[in-house]
Amino acid sequence: MANTLEQLKSYTTIVADTGDIEAIKRYQPEDATTNPSLILKAAQIPEYSYLIDNAIAWAQTQSTELEQQIDDASDKLAVNIGVEILKLVPGRISTEVDARLSFDKEKSIAKAHKLVRLYQEAGIDKSRILIKLASTWEGICAAKELEQEGINCNLTLLFSFAQARACAEAGVYLISPFVGRILDWYKKDTGKDYAPANDPGVVSVTEIYNYYKQHGYNTVVMGASFRNIGEIIELAGCDRLTIGPSLLEELANSQAQIQAKLLPATTTVAAETPLTEAQFRWDFNQDPMAVEKLAEGIRNFAIDQGKLEVMLKAKLSN
């Protein structure tokens, strides 16, 4: 009998949410996603020290200014890890733009161009890359321009329907609505526990998925940030699910029988008039959970980016 992970793969494209190359070898996902926190974690694995050494050496050929070298080494390391992962997955790698640029459209676009160039210099076509951006208004606007250039984007830190709708209207390739972090907020706010079917994160992703399919949007829905396999099983049938190694292992060790919970709409209705910036900001602001979790997510990614840069600075200063 097929284990739960194998069953899930028949309904949903499975993506590994990790920078750990060994974990990717083990679970054979279609795609992989990274973020500043996962890059920091991967950078501390001794087997990957050669990827850091390569990034440091490359950065030193690009500039004599230490701050620029740190920036270059950080970008190159993320790409080096991505290149290694792409040797193992048939699909795409998601690489994230510096979270500190989340409110700067032009700098986000420039950073995306740099990451794509570094991948291309390593022999990787842009068709195998997704540029990850936070789902701020500025991030969504940056993604809209990048998509028009043929650079596909993954809009992350997505906690609200307003963010999801704006992403679809911008023609974004893929969104990553966060399930577990929504659950965290509601558990803390209400003091309640939630069964997977009533999990606020599961409910949010289901609503977004149904809206996209009903309105004929092509934007891929990739549920992310899971706290337990119950959430994952409730979202079987979602376009994609990005799952960390510990939950992939739990799914692989489970024999639970599952079925598709999310199904594409049989009929579609016309899309609504796109949100204006003012409407987006108002609708988003009406959701305290989304406001708090987006801000927290950006801050935490920025903290881990800073820790990575401290590590790189020490190596560059030797």
UniProtKB/Swiss-Prot annotation:
Pathway: Carbohydrate degradation; pentose phosphate pathway; D-glyceraldehyde 3-phosphate and beta-D-fructose 6-phosphate from D-ribose 5-phosphate and D-xylulose 5-phosphate (non-oxidative stage): step 2/3. It is found in: Cytoplasm. Its EC number is 2.2.1.2. The active site is at K132 (schiff-base intermediate with substrate). It catalyses: D-sedoheptulose 7-phosphate + D-glyceraldehyde 3-phosphate = D-erythrose 4-phosphate + beta-D-fructose 6-phosphate. GO terms for biological process: carbohydrate metabolic process; pentose-phosphate shunt. It is an enzyme of class 2 (transferase). GO terms for molecular function: transaldolase activity. InterPro entries: Aldolase_TIM (IPR013785), TAL/FSA (IPR001585), Transaldolase_1 (IPR004730), Transaldolase_AS (IPR018225). Keywords: Cytoplasm, Pentose shunt, Schiff base, Transferase. Its main location: cytoplasm. It holds the Pfam family TAL_FSA. GO terms for cellular component: cytosol. Belongs to the transaldolase family. Type 1 subfamily. Transaldolase is important for the balance of metabolites in the pentose-phosphate pathway. Homodimer. HAMAP family: Transaldolase_1. This is Transaldolase. It comes from Shewanella sp. (strain W3-18-1). The gene is tal.
